[in-house]
Amino acid sequence: MFLTATALAVGALAGGAWTGSAEASDGAPAEDQGFSFEALVRKMKDKASGAYDPHTPELPQKFLDLDYDQHRAIRFQPERAVWKDSGSNYRLQAFHPGWLYKESVELFEIVEGKARPIHFTGADFAYRKPLNPEEFEGIDLPGIAGFRLHHPLNTPDYFDELIAFVGASYFRALGKGDVYGLSARGLCIDTAIAGPEEFPRFTRFYLERPEKGAAELRLYAELESERVAGAYRFTVKPGLNTIVEVDAHIFLRGDVERLGIAPLTSMFLYGENDRLGFDDYRPEVHDNDGLLILRRNGQRLWRPLRNPDKLALSFFGERSPAGFGLLQRDREFDHFQDTEAQYQRRPSLWIEPVKGWGRGHVMLAEIPADKEIYDNIAAFWVPEGDAKAGSEHRFSYRMIWGREPEPGTELAQVISTSTGHGGTAASDADPNLRKFVVEFQGKALSELGADAPLKPRLTIQNGALKHKQLQRLEGGSWRVVLDVARENASQPVEFILALQLEDADITETWMYQWSGNT
């Protein structure tokens, strides 16, 4: 359920360039209304006390009947972008409704403290073959599928895509030089439990009209589903790493088994640690290659991602984490060899709590996938305690999208994880004996000679260590080689590994899970 729904919600974005938008309504229509974030929070709290109304503006049947190719043939007219002639650093374009996007959203522009609707018509879009443009002439759009903001991110004379909101509560952003990769969500409810997942959706957006030359943009959103109502404030700050500050007020209508805060959604098909079963010229295929968690005491946990044989869940108990995120550490084109997907340019995303989040855990869900069109990785924060009907929750955090968004460190980092059958080159393959090769690199290690009293700090659960070797490689990186026998194939083998000098960690902590074949 999770895999399919996630893929449907964001798969169209992965397909390529969309555009769209219209001019904001002129004059002062009757719908103009005073706006403040405080009032929006009160509104959503009041809505949470009543039943959920899933009704959205009804779409014309011709929109509902669009298939994938027809929907992709609809492109926005760039010259009709909102704020195009305002001298602003931002332009807004809309995604056309239809195909998978049968629930429309509404957009409002905030001017001088008042919210006015932004209206779109068929004139804002180009209806290309195989569609007949005449069938869409003069048509009004009762709502849109979502929108994206453009900004001169890479060069001063071109408005690049910066951030896009489309499908449920999904959105994604870019840092300088990036191409779209992983997505974020406003909230996730009951992800990877025995029952169905619930997908809250952003139903209305309110965007402050950006001042001429303004560096940042602020927008607000209403979030709703059967068991939740929420008010969100986003402050977007483009740059080498694009920062999105989030202030989320969440009100529960019903009990929730697993409340996921700051959810991240990504794709890992195969990599150097896990590529069994893929006959592909590309050495690696993934949006991100690991989960990083930064603890308040400075300890850094690095968990390489996998594409498991069956659903795999990992839980990392924390008390007010300093941050967590899905990273793409591998930046070498030769490691991907994909001139179209450009996986080496996919952004990492770092979540940094603005205020203490208290006790809870970071959860990582890894879901089997056989194609790169499926997003099969999820990571999010689960606060401690019950999420009961009538409860209120507020979380503020900073999202950092880019090549290296995480804080710097003096600790050496894991630069590769490789696996294969255990034993020697002459050994027969044994499904219950596996080799793990972990390489660490950093100044703290490169300055050490081969005779340094460096030692591994190693813990293995549900497995037995058969062989261990520590090697200094040319260039100053260090490699740990482990042969491990599995005690029970039905139980995952868990690893914790760091390198120590004088009983103190000088590397981040590598964590891994071996289940099934990998």
Question: What positions do the PLM features span?
Answer:
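N-terminal export signals
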Residues: 1-24
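Terminal accessory/anchoring regions of large secretory-pathway or extracellular enzymes
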Residues: 25-68, 75-77, 95, 335-518
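Solvent-exposed N-terminal domain segments of exported/luminal and surface proteins
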Residues: 50-193
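A contiguous, surface-exposed recognition patch within enzymatic or periplasmic domains that forms
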Residues: 69, 140, 164, 179, ...
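Hydrophobic residues positioned within well-ordered beta-strands of beta-sheet architectures
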Residues: 105, 217-219, 230-234, 244-246, ...
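Short polybasic amphipathic segments
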Residues: 105-110, 325, 349, 497
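Extended, loop-rich substrate-binding clefts of extracytoplasmic carbohydrate-active enzymes
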Residues: 181-239, 358-370, 374
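Acidic, contiguous internal or C-terminal segments within carbohydrate-active enzymes
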Residues: 221-270
